[in-house]
Each structure stands twice: as structure tokens, then as C-alpha cells.
């Protein structure tokens, strides 16, 4: 059974114009917002991250991306579109951008090396040939953004990782072995990042499914990102992923 709520919008009826304007402003600013309507009293309000009796229910709806009823309240979810910023136009990135788009993400590639990030290798994709930290600042990052670093080159990966750690991205994954990550951790600590910051990094990247080929590693990355999005209580763990 499907329940559909239809509201007129006009003078003296339906949602207040100010509420709709505020909703539109939040959407434009990429702020997750729930439009809440009590179907008994027809009270209406917007729920973001401010304290509200429906906050817990709204947060659960944000994570599931599903609107629905909580008692007499209809909660309409307005989440910003998902984005994935991939640093490093390497072989793994080719299947990953396709999988990301199928999963509902807007993928963007960052690689200053034009021979790697070429239109021939990534037809129709958004490619920024800029230094990663500058590119990430230009693109902007928020709680609906996943960042994946794949270059295996600290000169390119580290600036992107540092920029991502200063943001609210919901996922940050980095290619490299456990040994590579240990060296990365030392560099980040020297740069002033604490244990809580560094613990946000998923490395070695990807779910531990024994992936070997670029496509398989892309699948493992997509699986891990999905888990982090849908089960935000999960924390990064070191795995035996063969991403040398």
C-alpha cells in the first residue's frame, strides 16, 4: 500500500510560504532538512540539526534517505545529492566512477596529471587538473561527500587527506598497504592531526573481500562507502585488503 500526501500551496492554504522558502534555501546550501507535517493538527516545521522532539527519527530518515511516517508526523527527507571525490585518475578509478554513478553519487575526478585524467580515459566525467587540496577546496566538502585517494603518491594524496580531515566528509578512504598507512599516520601526526582525526581514515581502503583486480577493488570501495553511509555507527578498521 502506498500513502501519498498532497498539499496545496497558495495564499491561505498549504505550507506557509516562509517555510517553503526556508526549505528551498536549505536545499540550495546543501543542508540536510526534514519537512515535518502533523497529519492530525497540520502543524508544520523544518528539522535540521537543531534539538527537536523528532530529531532522532529525522536522523534515522537522513541516513536511510527515506521519507515516511512517525506516528502522526510525516517526515519528508530532503538530503543533498551524494558526491564522491576521487583523487587519482588511476585504473581503479575507471570502474569506480561508473559504480558511484549507479549508486546515486555525482563522481568527480581530481588529478593534476593530464595524461592520467584525460577525457579519453574518462569520457564524459568531471575532471579537475588541479593540485588536490586546491581542487577539494574549490569543490567543497560536507557530510554528503565521500573522498577516495588512489594516487599512492604522498605528494598528491596527503594534501587531499588533510583537506578532507578538516571537513565533515562522511567517508575518507586511502589506497595503500598497512605499512604505507603507518607512514601516512606518522606524517599526519607530524602535521598536527590527532588520533581522533586520523581514526576517520579507512585504510587500507575497501571492504575485506579479497579483491585483486581494479574492478574488484572498486567494488570493495563502493561496499565500504555504502556501509559507512547507511551504518554511520561503524568505524574504520584496518583490513587485509590487498591494495598495495
Region roles according to the model:
Residues 90-91, 154-155, 179:
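Residue-level detector of alpha-helix initiation sites
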Residues 99-105, 163-166, 189-190:
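Short, solvent-exposed amphipathic alpha-helical segments in soluble enzyme
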Residues 111, 151, 176:
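Short beta-strand/turn micro-motifs composed of small residues
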Residues 133-143:
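Short amphipathic alpha-helix with an adjacent loop that forms part of the alpha/beta core around
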Amino acid at each position: 500500500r502506498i500513502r501519498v500526501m498532497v498539499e496545496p500551496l497558495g495564499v491561505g492554504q498549504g505550507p506557509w510560504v516562509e517555510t517553503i522558502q526556508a526549505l528551498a534555501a536549505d536545499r540550495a546550501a546543501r543542508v540536510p532538512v526534514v519537512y515535518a507535517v502533523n497529519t492530525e493538527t497540520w502543524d508544520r516545521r523544518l528539522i535540521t540539526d537543531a534539538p527537536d522532539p523528532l530529531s532522532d527519527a529525522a536522523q534515522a530518515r537522513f541516513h536511510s534517505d527515506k521519507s515516511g511516517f512517525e506516528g502522526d508526523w510525516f517526515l519528508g527527507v530532503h538530503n543533498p545529492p551524494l558526491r564522491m571525490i576521487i583523487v587519482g585518475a588511476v585504473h581503479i578509478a575507471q570502474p569506480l566512477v561508473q559504480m558511484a554513478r549507479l549508486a546515486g553519487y555525482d563522481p568527480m575526478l581530481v588529478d593534476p596529471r593530464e595524461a592520467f585524467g584525460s577525457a579519453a580515459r574518462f569520457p564524459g566525467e568531471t575532471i579537475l587538473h588541479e593540485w588536490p587540496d586546491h581542487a577539494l577546496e574549490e569543490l567543497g566538502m560536507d557530510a554528503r561527500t565521500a573522498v577516495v585517494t588512489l594516487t599512492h603518491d604522498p605528494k598528491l594524496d596527503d594534501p587531499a587527506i588533510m583537506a578532507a580531515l578538516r571537513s565533515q566528509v562522511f567517508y575518507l578512504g586511502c589506497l595503500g598497504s598497512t605499512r604505507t598507512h603507518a607512514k601516512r599516520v606518522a606524517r599526519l601526526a607530524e602535521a598536527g592531526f590527532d588520533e581522533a582525526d586520523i581514526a576517520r581514515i579507512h585504510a587500507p581502503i575497501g571492504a575485506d573481500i579479497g579483491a585483486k583486480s581494479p574492478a574488484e577493488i572498486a567494488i570493495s570501495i563502493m561496499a565500504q562507502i555504502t556501509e559507512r553511509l547507511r551504518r554511520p555507527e561503524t568505524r574504520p578498521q584496518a583490513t587485509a585488503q590487498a591494495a598495495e
